């Protein structure tokens, strides 16, 4: 069972929130990052005895949302000066690509867990 985040009018798993941002059905500016962090810390506390891989996947998604929002809040001059390494998310399109990549690895991970449990 996935942890349910409650943010503004949204309630559901973090990967659904990322999907809504990715498909422009939810505006990143409407997301209170402080709430995501608080919810994530609650999740970590409740899951600390369980699978660290699950906790780390939520951390990656939360970090991507935080990074995208911070980039969107930076003025255009600073955006041009920002580094352009492979981990940098400088636009909503970059976030969409990262989410698609995350979803691919999440499915692979789930398949590996199923194989391991057989």
Whereabouts are the PLM-identified features?
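Long, charge-dense, low-complexity tracts
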Residues: 1-118
């Amino acid at each position: 069972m996935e942890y349910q985040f409650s943010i503004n009018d949204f309630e559901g798993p973090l990967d659904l929130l990322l999907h809504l941002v990715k498909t422009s059905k939810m505006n990143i500016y409407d997301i209170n990052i402080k709430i995501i962090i608080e919810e994530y810390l609650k999740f970590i506390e409740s899951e600390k005895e369980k699978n660290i891989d699950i906790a780390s996947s939520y951390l990656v998604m939360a970090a991507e949302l935080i990074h995208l929002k911070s980039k969107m809040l930076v003025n255009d001059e600073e955006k041009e000066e920002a580094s352009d390494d492979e981990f940098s998310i400088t636009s909503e399109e970059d976030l969409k690509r990262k989410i698609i990549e995350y979803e691919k690895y999440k499915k692979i991970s789930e398949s590996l867990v199923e194989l391991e449990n057989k």
